[in-house]
Curated annotation (Swiss-Prot):
It comes from Danio rerio. Keywords: Cleavage on pair of basic residues, Disulfide bond, Glycoprotein, Growth factor, Secreted, Signal. GO terms for cellular component: extracellular region; extracellular space. Pfam families: TGF_beta. Neurotrophic factor that enhances survival and morphological differentiation of dopaminergic neurons and increases their high-affinity dopamine uptake. Acts by binding to its coreceptor, GFRA1, leading to autophosphorylation and activation of the RET receptor. The gene is gdnf. It comes from the Eukaryota. Residues 34-60, 91-137 are annotated as: Disordered. Homodimer; disulfide-linked. Interacts with GFRA1 coreceptor and RET: forms a 2:2:2 ternary complex composed of GDNF ligand, GFRA1 and RET receptor. This is Glial cell line-derived neurotrophic factor. Residues 20-87 form a propeptide. First expressed at 14 hours post-fertilization (hpf) in the ventral half of anterior somites and in intermediate mesoderm. Ventral somitic expression persists and extends more posteriorly over the next 12 hours. Expressed throughout the ventral trunk mesoderm and endoderm at 24 hpf. By 30 hpf, somitic expression ceases and by 36 hpf, expression becomes restricted to the endodermal cells forming the gut, with expression along the whole length of the developing gut tube at 72 hpf. Residues 119-128 have a biased composition (Basic residues). Belongs to the TGF-beta family. GDNF subfamily. One of its GO terms (biological process) is metanephros development.
């Protein structure tokens, strides 16, 4: 569309130049010749109406104008050729710019896809490590487990339909036993110690969940403290 707009502008300039009156460019010498020759005409001819003189003058002026057109045509043609040259150069540059933009977009998309791929691989490796940790943790002994219960199931004397997640510690602590624990266990097994000897190392909570409050069937509020384990260890 840009090329056609410029060509239409050039054609309008050309048509305006071809139809524009150029009386102000007439050569004064030719006008002087016409005036100097007019008194020498025959009286009979002078007696004729002067209506034919304007026609003759207009024909002469038109004849003179045709001599001036080539210069203006050359100017217009030079302008058109220069405009077409610029359009050719711009048409050669625009495809190259488009190709460069396409390459840049392709490179950006490749980098984005590569970044997403690396992120997904990192996340998959992280999930695999977490699964391995869970599998290994199952064999480490003392673990934190959970169960969904009703508050009434806790047998603390509350009658309510409120529910909670109860977390507890479970598992052996053989790996956490010290020589003291082993000696104590051996002496107890050989009945060389009294029955009131402290128990062995066991899996117990070392941190508890936040307190919870609930409304029982009698519309009374109650609060449970240190009711659920948050972190476990062999103690």
């Amino acid at each position: 569309m840009k090329l056609w707009d410029i060509l239409a502008t050039c054609l309008l300039l050309l048509s305006s130049v071809s139809t524009r009156p150029l009386f102000h460019k007439l050569q004064p010498s030719k006008r002087a010749v016409v005036r100097s020759e007019s008194p020498a005409l025959d009286p009979i001819i002078d007696s004729q109406p002067e209506t034919s003189n304007p026609k003759q003058a207009s024909m002469e002026e038109q004849y003179d104008l045709t001599g001036l057109y080539p210069e203006q045509f050359e100017d217009v043609m030079d302008f058109i050729e220069a405009t077409l040259g610029r359009l050719r150069r711009s048409s050669d540059v625009e495809p190259q710019m488009k190709r460069d933009r396409v390459r840049q977009k392709a490179a950006a998309n490749t980098e984005k896809s590569g970044g997403r791929g690396r992120g997904e691989r990192k996340r998959s490796r992280g999930r695999a490590r977490s699964r391995d940790d869970r599998v290994k943790g199952q064999g480490r002994g003392c673990l934190l487990k959970e169960i969904h219960l009703n508050v009434t199931d806790l047998d603390l004397g509350y009658r309510t339909k409120e529910e909670l997640i109860f977390r507890y510690c479970s598992g052996p602590c053989h790996d956490a036993e010290t020589n003291y624990d082993k000696i104590l266990n051996n002496l107890t097994h050989n009945k060389k110690l009294d029955k009131d000897t402290p128990s062995r190392t066991c899996c117990r909570p070392i941190a508890f969940d936040d307190d919870i409050s609930f409304l029982d069937d009698s519309l009374e509020y109650h609060t449970l403290k240190k009711h659920s384990a948050k972190k476990c260890a062999c103690v």
